[in-house]
């Protein structure tokens, strides 16, 4: 009996070890969606920042039987399409059928001598003959075939959660990943805004354009903390982007006034120029190299000086130059989103076009990117100047072929299905890619926004939306209200015993250049010391002085 008891104990302990081992394997194998998304930020110094959980987004709803019914419908349509093509005297063979979440692609290999244009122009007639909502026909690049896209009988809803939780998004190396949706084969489509480097979006009412912009913003907010990504949101319609008010990523409140929108774009141009000057001082060409060098300089304690003119020699008349230590700080990416360009072009067309042109031509290397959207992709809104500087463009459903050609240079956007169905032309690629955008509920956006607000308050810069003439009056920070502002800065520095450009910028909500001039004046008046070898300054006077 004793040996039987021992054997029982041995078998039980062995079984217990196997259970523990299996549990450990299970823990390793299955990570929470939140952990998988956080994996992208493990190398970043954001220990205090809590990234949004994937649980804030809704799970995809799967309806049983839809795939099977769509498959049967595709088989029926294959025979029907062959008969319809024959009726229109188009010779060829349907060589492949690929079913996607929204449409099914029928690959047609036309007979020798058949012109592609003769098939493409029959798109509307083929749709009518097959009782389809619409049909899109295009050439397949690199192959002797045409793609005929016919909507499925039952349309599958694409959810943002399944895109963000996909392997494609979690393992991407993109710096600014945008989740666009799924292609016609059901594969997630992730693009990098940093490579575009700017994006032009068009689509009529009900096309899914605004929902698509929300999906793009959320995909950025899920992986980028406020110290690495700043947003300027311009929403003249006052409806679409106001939900993001007061998230810590914002540089200024959501801009709804057209004149303030002009000021915000002009401020962005000045910020771009300021960044280029700083990069020139460090001898680098782009923001990633600048940030890497700044981190190395701070770690090593090395100081970089710049020469500034402080006056003229009374005898020779030559300028007197002095060396000043640079305040070294890394630059976050800045993304400017304009939700309705048409409204701004009506009120301030020339100023808006000039600012957008300047930014789209030069801002990429400074880490500044644009997402510009409009409901009216006409030539008076999307001018040749604007379009030529946006090589990457997205078109949701538009009214007619003219609008389609205006935005993507080709016809086809007028045949889209709406509700997130889009065509994208990428920089450096000739072919159009059809994507089905994800559906994002207002409640999902609000849940993510509420979470972000708990992570901290935004540090708004009033100078972003300040009027141009007011900016000129107070740019020196030395006259009228400028003296009062300077006195406030001195009081804060003496009270807190801290002095830096960024410290003044945060507390007074002013721009970098203006804060830098205030610090320089404090140094010249003996209130703060020159920057030491690590760029820090000592406050030389007390609060009682």
Residue ranges and their predicted role:
Residues 1-198, 226:
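Low-complexity, intrinsically disordered P/S/T-rich segments
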Residues 21-93, 290, 298-328, 447-484, ...:
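Charged, low-hydrophobicity low-complexity segments
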Residues 56-70, 107-113, 197-203, 247-255, ...:
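Short hinge/gating elements
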């Amino acid at each position: 009996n004793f040996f039987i008891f021992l054997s029982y104990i041995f078998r039980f302990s062995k079984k217990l070890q196997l259970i523990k081992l299996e549990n450990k394997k299970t823990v390793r194998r299955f990570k929470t969606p939140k952990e998988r998304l956080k994996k992208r930020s493990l190398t970043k110094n954001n220990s205090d920042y809590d990234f949004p959980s994937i649980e804030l987004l809704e799970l995809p709803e799967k309806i049983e039987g839809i795939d099977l019914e769509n498959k049967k419908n595709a088989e029926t349509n294959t025979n029907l399409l062959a008969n319809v093509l024959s009726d229109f005297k188009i010779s060829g063979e349907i060589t492949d059928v690929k079913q996607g979440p929204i449409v099914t692609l029928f690959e047609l290999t036309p007979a020798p001598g058949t012109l592609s244009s003769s098939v493409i122009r029959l798109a509307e007639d083929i749709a009518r003959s097959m009782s389809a909502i619409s049909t899109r026909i295009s050439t397949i690049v690199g192959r002797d075939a045409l793609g005929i896209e016919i909507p499925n009988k039952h349309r599958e809803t694409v959810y943002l959660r399944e895109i963000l939780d996909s392997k494609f998004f979690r393992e991407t190396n993109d710096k600014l990943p945008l989740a666009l949706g799924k292609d016609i084969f059901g594969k997630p489509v992730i693009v990098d805004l940093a490579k575009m480097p700017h994006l032009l979006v068009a689509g009529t009412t009900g096309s899914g354009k605004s929902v698509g912009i929300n999906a793009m913003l959320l995909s950025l907010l899920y992986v980028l903390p406020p110290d690495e990504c700043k947003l300027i949101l311009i929403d003249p319609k006052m409806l679409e982007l106001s939900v993001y008010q007061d998230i810590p990523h914002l540089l200024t409140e959501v801009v709804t006034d057209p004149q303030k929108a002009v000021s915000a774009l002009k401020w962005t141009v000045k910020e771009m120029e300021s960044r280029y000057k700083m990069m020139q001082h460090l001898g680098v060409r782009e923001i990633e190299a600048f940030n890497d060098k700044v981190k190395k300089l701070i770690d090593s304690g090395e100081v970089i000086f710049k020469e500034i003119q402080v006056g003229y020699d009374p005898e020779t008349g030559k300028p007197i130059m002095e060396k000043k230590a640079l305040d070294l700080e890394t630059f976050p990416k800045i993304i400017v989103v304009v939700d309705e360009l048409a409204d701004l072009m009506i009120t301030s067309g020339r100023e808006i076009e000039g600012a957008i042109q300047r930014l789209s031509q030069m801002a990429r290397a400074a880490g500044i990117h644009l997402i510009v959207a409009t409901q009216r992709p006409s030539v008076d809104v999307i001018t040749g100047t604007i379009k030529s500087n946006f090589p990457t463009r997205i078109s949701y459903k538009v009214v007619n072929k003219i609008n389609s050609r205006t935005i993507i240079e080709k016809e086809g956007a007028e045949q889209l299905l709406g509700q997130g169905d889009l065509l994208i032309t990428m920089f450096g690629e000739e072919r159009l890619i059809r994507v089905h955008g994800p559906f994002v509920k207002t409640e999902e956006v609000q849940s993510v926004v509420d979470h972000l607000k708990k992570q901290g308050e935004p540090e708004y810069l009033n100078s972003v939306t300040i009027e141009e003439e007011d900016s000129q009056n107070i740019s020196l920070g030395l006259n009228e209200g400028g003296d009062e502002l300077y006195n406030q800065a001195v009081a804060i520095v003496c009270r807190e015993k801290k002095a830096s450009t960024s410290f003044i910028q945060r507390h007074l909500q002013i721009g970098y250049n203006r804060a830098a001039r205030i610090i320089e004046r404090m140094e010249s008046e003996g209130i703060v010391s020159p920057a030491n070898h690590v760029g820090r300054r000592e406050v030389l006077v007390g609060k009682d002085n």
